[in-house]
């Protein structure tokens, strides 16, 4: 494995490293992120450990449960740029935007990146950062399953 993403939940930062042909690790990028906070209901702490990136996609859709005619269903309520799956239900993605947001919700969320734990499990990034990471993870990958890209080079995510 030559590609690593290390996420520090205490400092709300992330470092991306790649081993070169001389077996030296180089810092590719270092940035602020927002990780998950457990609220006991529907929000969870970002899982700690080592994970292999399973797949990526160009966007992340968010849903909310609604009850219609006594039946529970999921309705798409927002999206975010990029989606990198690193654990069961845990993703790295851009700033989430509600489909009904007519105010400054996106700017408020963006202003909190790197400050404190706030997401529902995922790792939030600035949009330009997640775009860069998505290209770096996928590099020349051509394996597609629906709208998911399967990285050809393994990428390990370490959450501490």
Where are these regions (language model features)?
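Gly/Pro-biased beta-strand-loop elements
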Residues: 1-103
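Exported/periplasmic cell-wall-interacting domains
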Residues: 60-160
């Amino acid at each position: 494995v030559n590609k690593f993403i290390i996420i520090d939940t205490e400092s709300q930062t992330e470092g991306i490293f790649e081993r070169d042909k001389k077996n030296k690790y180089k810092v590719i990028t270092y940035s602020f992120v927002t990780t998950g906070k457990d609220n006991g209901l529907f929000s969870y702490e970002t899982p700690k450990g080592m994970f292999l990136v399973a797949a990526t996609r160009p966007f992340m859709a968010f849903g909310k449960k609604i009850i219609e005619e006594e039946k529970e269903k999921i309705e798409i309520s927002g999206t975010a740029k990029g989606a990198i799956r690193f654990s069961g239900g845990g993703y790295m993605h851009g700033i989430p935007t509600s489909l009904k947001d007519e105010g400054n919700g996106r700017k408020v969320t963006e202003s909190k990146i790197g400050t404190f734990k706030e997401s529902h499990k995922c790792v939030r990034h600035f949009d330009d950062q997640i775009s860069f990471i998505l290209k770096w993870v996928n590099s020349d990958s051509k394996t597609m399953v629906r709208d998911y890209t399967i990285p050809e080079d393994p990428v390990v995510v370490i959450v501490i």
